[in-house]
Amino acid sequence: MNPETFIEKYAAALATQDWQQVDPLVHPDACVTFSSGAVHVGQTAVRQAFERNFSLIQDERYAIENVHWVMQGEDTAVYLFTFHWSGIINGKPTSGAGTGSSVLINSENGWQLLVEHLGPKTG
């Protein structure tokens, strides 16, 4: 797997709303910041945050677009992106979008998410 393939697998795994699909793609030391400003450090905290979102948002659709590679090396890759999501929350259609930045690390388990920072949509 290369960093580009990682993004495809990550988006597909998130779309399943099943942590078991996402887990192999998240580094044990991962740190994820949601657009709300909530910071989740470590794979356990990240898992709990994602599972909370999975249970809150039904039939979620998630897309990563406009990927811009800041750098790609043999062991590290950094990219910027936009994201869009939609789903049902409390019986009502809901959606959102924003920007993000991610750091990937090529570990003994292949490419994994080390840092993800999601922010509000700009411009």
Sequence positions of predicted segments:
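A beta-strand edge to alpha-helix "cap/lid" segment located at domain peripheries
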Residues: 1-21, 31-123
